[in-house]
Amino acid sequence: MVLRKTYHFSWRDYTLEFGRQTCIMGVVNVTPDSFSDGGRFYDHHAAAAQGEKLVAEGAAIIDIGGESTRPFSEPVTVEEEIRRVVPVIEKLAQRVSVPISIDTTKAAVARRALEAGASIINDVSALRFDPGLAVLAAEFDTPLILMHMLGDPKSMQVL
C-alpha cells in the first residue's frame, strides 16, 4: 500500500488540495492572437462564458490572460491589457467559486486584476520583466506563480 501525501494550500477564502487528484487550471486568453484558441475568446462575454464552462468541466483555477506570449508576438500596453482582462475577471468573480488567476508580467495589470476579483498572479517571466509583481503579491497576500520562458516572446524561438 502506497501512502500519498496531500498538501493544503490556503489563502483568503480559498483552499486547494494537492496530492489526491490532479488540479486543473483552465486557461482563457482574451487576445486576438492566442496560440491555444485562435482568439475565440477575445470578446468579454465569450471569455466569461468559457471560464464558466471550464469550471463546470472541473477546472480548479481559471487563468485569465490579456497579452499573447506565443512566439514572435507583439507586446501590448498596460492600458490595453487591463481593458481586455478586467471586465472578464469582474464577471467571473461574481459567477464562479474557484480562484481566478491573472496571467501577466506587469504589476499595474495585476493590481487592477486583483482589485477586480483575481486572487492569484501568474507571471510567465518569473519576475524578470517586472519585479514589482513580488511586492504586489505580498501587499495583497496572494499567491504568485512563477513560470519559465527563455528570453521574451519575440526572441524565445531564436535563443
Regions found by a protein language model. Name each.
Residues 1-29:
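N-terminal amphipathic alpha-helix/helix-capping segment at the start of soluble metabolic enzymes
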Residues 19-24, 59-60, 94-98, 118-119, ...:
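Short, well-ordered coil/turn segments that N-cap beta-strands
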Residues 74-102, 111, 138-149:
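Alpha-helix-loop-beta-strand connector modules within alpha/beta enzyme cores
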Residues 28, 54, 58, 103, ...:
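Conserved, mostly hydrophobic/aromatic
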Residues 27-49, 74-75, 79, 99-101, ...:
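Active-site mouth loops of central-metabolism enzymes
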Residues 95-105, 119-129:
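Catalytic beta/alpha-barrel core
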Residues 32-34, 69-72, 116, 124-159:
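Conserved anion-binding
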Residues 34-36, 60-87:
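Glycine-rich, proline-tolerant flexible connector loops at the mouths of alpha/beta enzymes
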